[in-house]
Swiss-Prot record:
One of its GO terms (cellular component) is host cell cytoplasm. It comes from Influenza A virus (strain A/Victoria/3/1975 H3N2). InterPro entries: INFV_PA, PA/PA-X, PA/PA-X_sf. Its EC number is 3.1.-.-. Plays an essential role in viral RNA transcription and replication by forming the heterotrimeric polymerase complex together with PB1 and PB2 subunits. The complex transcribes viral mRNAs by using a unique mechanism called cap-snatching. It consists in the hijacking and cleavage of host capped pre-mRNAs. These short capped RNAs are then used as primers for viral mRNAs. The PB2 subunit is responsible for the binding of the 5' cap of cellular pre-mRNAs which are subsequently cleaved after 10-13 nucleotides by the PA subunit that carries the endonuclease activity. This is Polymerase acidic protein. A motif (Nuclear localization signal 2 (NLS2)) lies at residues 184-247. Belongs to the influenza viruses PA family. Pfam families: Flu_PA (PF00603). The gene is PA. GO terms for molecular function: endonuclease activity; metal ion binding; RNA binding. Mn(2+) 2 binds at E80, D108.
Length: 716
């Protein structure tokens, strides 16, 4: 029988039948009659559909294959022969677009002219018996049944045979031919007698024994047995009626579905108040580096040695003084702290051998700056149960802050190219499989686009600072250790370079829990005059500490050098994530990769090379008040990387909340743009949830502003 099937039927039909039997665990070498029956059924379904089209007037016409009008719309959608998931997707799509009622079982075809699903039956028994079995199983008036037999008989719902007589005759002739061929080979009797009552392959695929017991134990709540759950899943409608879902909820849920139109959404309301301030753990665009090229000094690679060597490259030190005080701090203590750092570094240089680490003297100014003895004494809760007025201390609501232009400038700067190379990804061996070759090619192209990017500098700076601070917090818990803020890079010519941004002094760090805080004072070099944007530097005390000679097109010029000093704090968990900032490279690479995959699937070949080397093509980068901003693929890579880096640098509960809630509104707007006619309930509540996250965080406020630009242009 198997040989007969392979000779008698089209190879595509044979392949589909093999897949169907494999899917339900049936062996076609044993179940040869089943194999023949599936092939026959598939062929009848395809013949039913062949040559039938709908013209522009909506009339059904029969067109032979050579006819130039074959571009007309097919009258029948073939569902049989697809894998289950795809078949249900097609059925759901038809139901959504035509309003047809969803069938309980997968039908074989959909008739676009009559707007109904069709169940095709091919029987070796009495036609009317088989028809009744089908009707009892389907139990739906909306699915049309059409039965064919090998004897030339037929039966259809309400005697409506759908097809013209010639098309039906073609199918009957083919079935009669199959029967004759089987009879000639002595296969017909076995085939005819093997037909059981109406069933599907899936119904006959029974799970028994231990697997059955495990299946019944693994069901979600409210399902008594596997059959009930299977029926529920088969009938589940992903785009089902929201009202129906709501009706199953608590009686207190009272939601009315409102249509979401272009005029529905309003802009997100950003808070009023004083401008927001810089809150990153280290300076970004305003940082200044003291650098040494091709370092080869004694102790090269030891942070303190490197720092002293970098400090020696600058000769413009002067008596420091305060140019922008911290409003609430004791500014003289910040000034004294810097003087202490300079003095203790000088002491180190006077020693015969420079130590590997430097612990600062615990002076009154450092104790104040690091909050020593400032924390309230912790008392065990069990010892205060009897205190009648025990309560949590009052904390003020955070003051609302408005968006300020400096954060957009910071982001723009992070996307720019520098004149240094900040990452060198290690070689990871030869590529063996083709997929590895493609992955390496993508990684190399991406690295070339972002290795000079300022956001990549921030990654390496963040990794170094957090690693050094966590190490010191564990190794020198009671000491006020001096930690240089260092990064390493290469010049365009390939020369190594070590950079010093400033110093951190760590406070006491007995960090038992992940969230226990270690205080530190940061002192960072800069050429930015804080008086230009004083609101940005609210948390800082800024000193003028020297004059730097800069070369420019018009010759040398002197610029004042500033030191930005502030008290800050971090925790083990924050340092742990800071150490892993390189993940930002991976995240943005994956986003670029999904763009390449989308392009490749359209072109049906890998488009990596074209994607990166076609310099003339521009890509959307983001929304601005001017509209959709576009740029080269390199600019897209750097922008995505900068977004990922800023998400890490400015991580906060406000950002988590805004990202989660605004995503819901974004999905609804995208559904509207895709003409999916979305409906919403409690849109006001969603806006409330979004806007309660807009408090004072500069990065969140900027993202909200971008979201408003997107809303404006998306709904034009």
């Amino acid at each position: 029988m198997e040989d007969f099937v392979r000779q008698c039927f089209n190879p595509m039909i044979v392949e589909l039948a093999e897949k169907a039997m494999k899917e339900y665990g049936e062996d076609l070498k044993i179940e040869t009659n089943k194999f023949a029956a599936i092939c026959t059924h598939l062929e009848v379904c395809f013949m039913y559909s062949d040559f039938h089209f709908i013209n522009e007037q909506g009339e059904s016409i029969v067109v032979e294959l050579d006819d130039p009008n074959a571009l007309l719309k097919h009258r029948f959608e073939i569902i049989e022969g697809r894998d289950r998931t795809m078949a249900w997707t097609v059925v759901n799509s038809i139901c959504n677009t035509t309003g047809a009622e969803k069938p309980k079982f997968l039908p074989d075809l959909y008739d676009y002219k009559e707007n109904r699903f069709i169940e095709i039956g091919v029987t070796r028994r009495e036609v009317h018996i088989y028809y009744l079995e089908k009707a009892n199983k389907i139990k739906s008036e909306n699915t049309h049944i059409h039965i064919f037999s090998f004897t030339g008989e037929g039966m259809a719902t309400k005697a409506d045979y759908t097809l013209d007589e010639e098309s039906r005759a073609r199918i009957k002739t083919r079935l009669f031919t199959i029967r004759q061929e089987m009879a000639n080979r002595g296969l017909w009797d076995s085939f005819r007698q093997s037909e059981r009552g109406e069933e599907t392959i899936e119904e006959r695929f029974e799970i028994t024994g231990t697997m059955r017991r495990l299946a019944d134990q693994s069901l979600p709540p409210n399902f008594s047995c596997l059959e009930n759950f299977r029926a529920y899943v088969d009938g589940f409608e992903p785009n089902g009626c929201i009202e129906g879902k709501l009706s199953q909820m608590s009686k207190e849920v009272n939601a009315k579905i409102e249509p979401f139109l272009k005029t529905t959404p309003r802009p997100i309301k950003l808070p009023d108040g004083p401008p927001c301030f810089q809150r990153s753990k280290f300076l970004l665009m305003d940082a200044l580096k003291l650098s040494i090229e091709d370092p080869s000094h004694e102790g090269e690679g030891i942070p303190l040695y490197d720092a002293i060597k970098c400090m020696r490259t600058f000769f413009g030190w002067k008596e420091p003084y305060i140019v922008k005080p911290h409003e609430r701090g004791i500014n003289s203590n910040y000034l004294l702290s810097w003087k202490q750092v300079l003095a203790e570094l000088q002491d180190i240089e006077n020693e015969e051998k420079i130590p590997r680490t430097k612990n600062m003297k615990k002076t009154s100014q450092l104790k104040w700056a690091l909050g020593e003895n400032m924390a309230p004494e912790k008392v065990d809760f069990d010892n205060c149960r009897d205190i009648s007025d025990l309560k949590q201390y009052d904390s003020d609501e955070p003051e609302l802050r408005s968006l300020s232009s400096w954060i957009q400038n910071e982001f723009n700067k992070a996307c720019e190219l520098t004149d240094s190379i900040w990452i060198e990804l290690d070689e990871i061996g030869e590529d063996v499989a083709p997929i590895e070759y493609i992955a390496s090619m993508r990684r190399n192209y991406f690295t070339a686009e972002v290795s000079h990017c300022r956001a990549t500098e921030y990654i390496m700076k963040g990794v170094y600072i957090n690693t050094a601070l966590l190490n010191a917090s564990c190794a020198a818990m009671d000491d006020f250790q001096l930690i240089p803020m260092i990064s390493k890079c290469r010049t365009k010519e390939g020369r190594r370079k070590t950079n010093l941004y400033g110093f951190i002094i760590k406070g006491r760090s007995h960090l038992r829990n992940d969230t226990d805080v270690v205080n530190f004072v940061s002192m960072e070099f800069s050429l930015t005059d804080p008086r230009l944007e004083p609101h940005k530097w609210e948390k800082y005390c800024v000193l003028e500490i020297g004059d730097m000679l800069l070369r420019s097109a018009i010759g040398q010029m002197s610029r004042p050098m500033f030191l930005y000093v502030r008290t800050n704090g971090t925790s083990k968990i924050k340092m742990k994530w800071g150490m892993e900032m390189r993940r930002c490279l991976l995240q943005s690479l994956q986003q670029i990769e999904s763009m390449i995959e989308a392009e490749s699937s359209v072109k049906e070949k890998d488009m990596t090379k074209e994607f990166f080397e076609n310099k003339s093509e521009t890509w959307p980068i983001g929304e601005s008040p001017k509209g959709v901003e576009e740029g080269s693929i390199g600019k897209v890579c750097r922008t995505l990387l900068a977004k990922s880096v800023f998400n890490s640098l400015y991580a906060s509960p406000q950002l988590e909340g805004f990202s989660a809630e605004s995503r819901k509104l974004l999905l609804v707007v995208q559904a509207l743009r895709d003409n999916l006619e979305p409906g919403t309930f409690d849109l006001g509540g969603l806006y409330e949830a979004i806007e309660e996250c807009l408090i004072n965080d500069p990065w969140v406020l900027l993202n909200a502003s971008w979201f408003n630009s997107f809303l404006t242009h998306a709904l034009r």
